[in-house]
């Protein structure tokens, strides 16, 4: 049963992500074809899949899964934003796919804005690596999949700082000097960002 539910969520995540989303051309829009395909997926779930669950009963769970896939490390969205997304979802017509896809795009736009802001902030920190305080008495969870999300932007930015500082410390403990650490982390950030910028809808659907 758990496997079948995961299959349902996978299909529904595809429905939320059907988009033509392309960070490459910076355009985020969906077409009538995407809406039609979303409706077809819903019909399959409700009428042909062996669980035959009604879409409204699992829409919130599907949106939650979409958010977790976008932000598994819980360092992009604030808790109040997650609560707002899920609350708005409860008030929507579950079968209005134009509204659902529009909301998914709005969420992805915020995700991309935050991703870029985090990248820029951490790059700046690396450019000033010699002045970083590596003796802070703060802990960071290696696995944040179950961690609490930040409650405001200030704490979110502090989390970004902590993540970068932790990466610096780990490389230093592995025997890298500051220049080597700076080079390696800068390369890592750039590679991750370049990969993100090349994302196309087909890639997102493979999540």
Where are these regions (language model features)?
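Compositionally biased regions
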Residues: 5, 20-23
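Bacterial N-terminal signal peptides
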Residues: 10-16
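Bacterial N-terminal signal peptides that target proteins for export
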Residues: 2-8
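Flexible, low-complexity junctional segments that flank or bridge functional domains
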Residues: 22-207
């Amino acid at each position: 049963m758990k496997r079948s539910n995961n299959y349902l969520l996978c299909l529904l995540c595809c429905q939320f992500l059907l988009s033509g989303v392309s960070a490459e051309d910076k355009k985020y829009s969906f077409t009538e074809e995407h809406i039609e395909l979303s409706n077809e997926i819903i019909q399959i779930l409700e009428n042909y899949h062996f669980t035959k669950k009604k879409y409204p009963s699992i829409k919130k769970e599907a949106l939650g899964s979409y958010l977790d896939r976008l932000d598994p490390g819980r360092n992009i969205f604030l808790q109040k934003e997650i609560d707002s997304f899920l609350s708005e979802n409860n008030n929507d017509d579950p079968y209005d796919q134009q509204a659902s896809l529009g909301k998914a795009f709005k969420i992805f736009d915020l995700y991309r804005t935050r991703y870029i802001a985090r990248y820029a902030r951490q790059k700046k920190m690396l450019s000033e690596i010699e002045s970083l305080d590596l003796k802070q008495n703060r802990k960071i969870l290696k696995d944040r999949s179950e961690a609490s999300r930040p409650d405001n932007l200030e704490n979110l930015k502090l989390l970004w700082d902590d993540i970068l500082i932790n990466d610096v410390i780990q490389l230093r403990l592995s025997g890298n000097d500051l220049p080597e650490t700076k080079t390696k982390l800068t390369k890592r950030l750039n590679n991750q960002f370049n990969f993100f910028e090349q994302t196309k809808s087909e890639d997102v659907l493979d999540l």
